[in-house]
From Swiss-Prot:
One of its GO terms (cellular component) is cytosolic large ribosomal subunit. This is Large ribosomal subunit protein uL16. HAMAP family: Ribosomal_uL16. It comes from Chlamydia felis (strain Fe/C-56) (Chlamydophila felis). The keyword rRNA-binding applies. Keywords: Ribonucleoprotein, Ribosomal protein, RNA-binding, rRNA-binding, tRNA-binding. NCBIfam families: rplP_bact (TIGR01164). Signal peptide: none annotated. GO terms for biological process: translation.
């Protein structure tokens, strides 16, 4: 699963979700992509499940790019622990996504195959997404 090799601080604050995605709003590598329509957290397990779903459907044809990286740690206290006594230990890693962010890109496959593969991957996420095609930017 994806996670940073090292970070400056082990624990982070929750942060804000407001606004649209600042970067990765266009398809830069592939021909087709999956774009978010909602804001939320995407865990490293969800990203890995999407990657496996796309690769299993496309088999050996095509190339896949993952455009998100889980760089935010989420802490959790042990079960049946009383409140207080500080913040919990880091439990898992998430990527903060806002509307407009490209999550995955696919190339060298037909539109139907790309659409099917990305639809299967979208079922693994907890946020709404849409299928997008590459547009030429000037």
């Amino acid at each position: 699963m994806l996670m940073p090799k090292r970070t400056k601080f082990r624990k982070q604050q929750k942060g804000q979700f407001a606004g649209l995605s600042k970067g990765a709003t266009f398809i830069d590598f592939g021909e087709f992509g999956m774009q978010t329509l909602e804001r939320g957290w995407v865990t490293s397990r969800q990203i890995e499940a999407c990657r496996v779903a796309i690769n299993r459907y496309l088999k050996r044809k095509g190339k896949v790019w993952i455009r998100v990286f889980p760089d935010k740690s989420v802490t959790k206290k042990p079960a049946e622990t009383r409140m207080g006594k500080g913040k919990g230990a880091p439990d898992h890693w998430v990527a903060v996504v806002r509307p407009g962010r490209i999550l995955f890109e696919v190339a060298n496959v037909s539109k139907e195959d790309a659409q099917d593969a990305l639809r299967r991957a979208a079922a693994k996420l907890g946020i709404r997404t849409r299928f997008v095609k590459r547009v030429e930017r000037v």
